[in-house]
């Protein structure tokens, strides 16, 4: 369900209130809070400012990157609503103590919002620009999300280092990755028409999980840490296993 513009405004004003309190508590950060939050008239303007300062470089200036992001937000307001839902998901899981923390400090949140820009550009056939954003996301956050992958709203990427999401992956709403190193990739050695996993709504994924191949993870499934998933999982399951199989062996004494 996409949030209304009124709901977005409610969260934005809550963020402003939180930042004003934080600024009173630590006035040394007044310039930081003003630049990132208080000088902006809307949530999407603040988010585009934050992302553009991260994704720019010496060739692609901050002003140029911000102009691209602002145009995306104007063309697709759904992306802004998704960002708010992602912030709420982090808060509702108890991973942050206030809404403003995610917007200001969460690299998983920032990587996800930058992916949403790249996905829009990819769908608009601006694939080289989308791949530029993918590369910047990978370099900055150690997160590799293909621009063509499909990711819903209310997504939690906590401690996002090492997350890899392949081109044909699909992640529905309210999916949580509660620690680092998730791999959603096609099966190895199958080059043509590689199909990546499909993750249904409400799935919770632990640390260091690999989900490989054309598999479907049923809704509200919990995948525990250090699990390798190679086959589809029915809804409402709890999955735990570490798979290893010798595919060839050479006697070193031969």
UniProtKB/Swiss-Prot annotation:
Keywords: Acyltransferase, Amino-acid biosynthesis, Cysteine biosynthesis, Cytoplasm, Repeat, Transferase
Pfam families in the cross-refs: Hexapep, SATase_N
Protein name: Serine acetyltransferase
Catalysis: reaction(s): L-serine + acetyl-CoA = O-acetyl-L-serine + CoA
Family: Belongs to the transferase hexapeptide repeat family.
SMART domains: SATase_N
The keyword Transferase appears for this protein: yes
Highest rank taxon of the organism: Bacteria
Any GO BP: cysteine biosynthetic process from serine
Molecular functions per Gene Ontology: serine O-acetyltransferase activity
Enzyme class: transferase
